Amino acid sequence: MSSGIGSLVKVIFKNFDVIAGPVISLVYPLYASVRAIESRSHGDDKQWLTYWALYSLIKLFELTFFRLLEWIPLYPYAKLALTSWLVLPGMNGAAYLYEHYVRSFLLSPHTVNVWYVPAKKDDDLGATAGKFTPVNDSGAPQEKIVSSVDTSAKYVGHSAFDDAYIY
């Protein structure tokens, strides 16, 4: 019987991130968020709103770089440690991370440095169009003749789904 319990403990320790990850990152925050909604104080609301914003950023990062992250052997444990720091009530990791990094990034004006500006070419649209303008025998550009539009034709809006549509 002891070998069965030993095997179970071994499996639990090997897969600790798989077992504890959803509990720490989803179950407890959902429970605490519902309690925060039902309470009258707004301090805990801010903690859990910032947690869910950071959780969505973490998930977006994971979905974007999942091929790279699967090659990092300690990533699940690092994510579990980070999530634990964000969630645990005494640490207020979500509020700290939001106030010091995310908020300052979102509120600061962003500038874009353009390191390469291509030189303007002589072949702009006007010059290119001039190359293909018809020329008469004297060498002068020929006036373009616009044909008159037949306005007597009536548009009958048929679609392929109408019974009167002719194939």
Curated annotation (Swiss-Prot):
Main localisation: membrane
Localization: Membrane
UniProt keywords, alphabetically: Membrane, Stress response, Transmembrane, Transmembrane helix
Induction data: By abscisic acid (ABA) and salt stresses.
Membrane topology: Multi-pass membrane protein
Transmembrane segments: 18-38, 47-67, 68-88
GO-annotated biological processes: hyperosmotic salinity response; response to abscisic acid
Gene Ontology, cellular component aspect: membrane
Tissue: Predominantly expressed in flower buds.
UniProt family annotation: Belongs to the DP1 family.
Annotated PANTHER family: HVA22-LIKE PROTEIN B, HVA22-LIKE PROTEINS
Name the record gives this protein: HVA22-like protein b
Gene behind this protein: HVA22B
